[in-house]
Amino acid sequence: MANTLEQLKLYTTIVADTGDIEAIKRYQPEDATTNPSLILKAAQIPEYESLIDNAIDWAKSQSDDLAQQLDDASDKLAVNIGVEILKLVPGRISTEVDARLSFDKEQSIAKAHKLVRLYKEAGVDKSRILIKLASTWEGICAAKELEKEGINCNLTLLFSFAQARACAEAGAYLISPFVGRILDWYKKDTGKDYDAVNDPGVVSVTEIYNYYKQHGFNTVVMGASFRNIGEIIELAGCDRLTIGPSLLEELANSQVDITPKLVAATSTVAAEAPLTEAQFRWDFNQDPMAVDKLAEGIRNFAIDQGKLEVMLTAKLAN
């Protein structure tokens, strides 16, 4: 009998949620995703020292201004790690726009253009990149413009149906609803435990998946941020699932029978008129979990970006 991971791959595209090249070699995912926290973690792996040195040297060659060097080194490091990962996966790498730009559409677009340019200079076509943006109104609007340019986007930190609907209406290539972080909020709020079937994160992704398929949206649903393999098993059949190394290992060592739980609708109905900004903000604001977790997610990514910059600043000073 095939292990649980191999069975899951029959129904769902598996993505590695890591910057760790050894983990990617081990589990052979289709794609990989990174974020500021994962880049920070990867930057502390000894094997990546040369990638950091390259980013520092390149940044110094671009400008004499320390702030600009820091910005350049950070972007170049994320791209260097992405380029290494793309040597191992047949699909795409997701690279994230600085979380501090989450409420600035124009700066998010500019950062996306820069990342795409850096990948191109490294020999990587934009068809192998997903630009990650927070699912704020501004991030969604940035994605809408980038998609028109042929730059595909991964809308992340997604916790609500309002965000998911707006992303699809904007023509985003892919969304990353955060299953485990939704569960975290409800466990803390209610003091209850949830089995996988009733897990609020699983329920949310199932609702989004069904809505997309019923209304003919092409936006890919990629469940993210898992707390246990039960959540993953309940989302078998989802377009994609991005999974961290520890849970990939648990799936590989498990022998649970997998059946698809999410099945695309065979017929579609017309979608409603797109949400206006006012409607989006109101609907999103009505979901206290989503409001809390989006704000927290942006703050935490910004904190880890800051930690990475402290490390890079020390190296730039040498």
Swiss-Prot record:
One of its GO terms (biological process) is carbohydrate metabolic process. Its main location: cytoplasm. The keyword RNA-binding does not apply. It catalyses: D-sedoheptulose 7-phosphate + D-glyceraldehyde 3-phosphate = D-erythrose 4-phosphate + beta-D-fructose 6-phosphate. GO terms for molecular function: transaldolase activity. SUPFAM superfamilies: Aldolase. It is an enzyme of class 2 (transferase). Keywords: Cytoplasm, Pentose shunt, Schiff base, Transferase. It is found in: Cytoplasm. Its EC number is 2.2.1.2. Pathway: Carbohydrate degradation; pentose phosphate pathway; D-glyceraldehyde 3-phosphate and beta-D-fructose 6-phosphate from D-ribose 5-phosphate and D-xylulose 5-phosphate (non-oxidative stage): step 2/3. Gene3D superfamilies: Aldolase class I (3.20.20.70). The active site is at 132 (schiff-base intermediate with substrate). One of its GO terms (cellular component) is cytosol. The keyword Cytoplasm applies. Belongs to the transaldolase family. Type 1 subfamily. Transaldolase is important for the balance of metabolites in the pentose-phosphate pathway. Homodimer. This is Transaldolase. It comes from Shewanella baltica (strain OS185). The lineage of its organism: Bacteria, Pseudomonadati, Pseudomonadota, Gammaproteobacteria, Alteromonadales.
